[in-house]
Amino acid sequence: MRLLSDGCISRPQGEVGELAVRGPGVMKCYYKNPEETAKVFTPDGWFRTGDLGWLSPDGWLYIKGRLKNMIVGPSGENIYPEEIESVLNSHVFVADSLVTEKEGRLIALVHFNRDELEARYEELKYDWEMKKDAWEKRIDELKKEVLDYVNSQVNRFSRLSEVVEEKEEFEMTPTKKIKRFLYNKRHGKDPVKEEDSKPHNTEAK
């Protein structure tokens, strides 16, 4: 196992890089597909997993997120959506979330836990005349609560600008992962350029 920078240069301990592996249990190539093989293997035969991580002084590997999901901030900071989503999902009223970028701002798409919401705002169940307006007011309050909750726990360049409610459950892949590309496209995230999808020289925090 080793951590890479720019595809093939090993990272020093403590710095974030792409995880590469090699061994008996790792595939050697894509069958009869040299082009795809070249994309995921280094010239000396290490398989690039697409995961970003760093090694602690005592040898523990910590995963930051996926290389293809990384967002480069306005001043070149590496922002890992999965780390922000972990904080979002720890909020009692958040069922699931996705962090994306829009016009240089970080946006959290959040699907709220309806059972928890109705337990908090139980009175809304019984007054159908006022329910819609009152519910929207409560949701606005909750979005502000979640925004403050997350921004108090992440570094300054990972702070959210806005929380947007996703009323329907997120569309998932067969492996139960959110189809990020659908929501990135829907909410205006700029396409990731090849040169921007590489970790900058950032110390692990």
Language model: regions and residue ranges:
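Short amphipathic alpha-helices in soluble, non-transmembrane regions
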Residues: 126, 142-147
